Amino acid sequence: QGTFDGMTIFENKKFSIHINTANGNTLNSPRGRYTLAHELGHYIIDSHRIALELGFLEPFPSKTNQKEHNSVERDADYVASCLVMPEIRYQKDIVGKKFDFDLIKFLSKEYNVSISACAIRFAQIGNHPIMIIYAESGIIKWTYYSDDFKYKTIINYPKISEHFLMGEYFTNHIKVEKTAQIW
């Protein structure tokens, strides 16, 4: 329990997808739906499937938030986001709407996905510049930003500046509500 969310395996000349339901990955949960779509991504992407089949790629236990730096995992995440948040429908849902955190929360509920998965999809196909930062204990683990995000260089890896809201949170343990202007 808790060791992985999903894994795609090839053994005995068969593919199988393992979903860790003990880790909150039920079929109707945001995490479970996305995990299943992510693992299907490994099967759908020819290079992943063939590499697993030939033994060039070892089965990798996917864990939410710990995979985004790995290009193989990002490829599978992209396929997953396309499956659970189709581009045309997603763009129809955002057209004419003001960008703020409430929009991301609305889309997250609409598509039954996590807020982070929804924000990353927004960075891929949305209509407003956005950067997503994932950090643990004040250390940046990964970032994702839209092509039109102008301030990519403001992030000072690996530590978060205390001048950012996230930095204030890690430095002073102060939770700050974000307004649309801060975004």
Task: Give, region by region, the residue ranges found by the protein language model.
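Active-site hotspot residues in diverse enzymes, especially metal/ion-binding acidic/histidine motifs
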Residues: 1-183
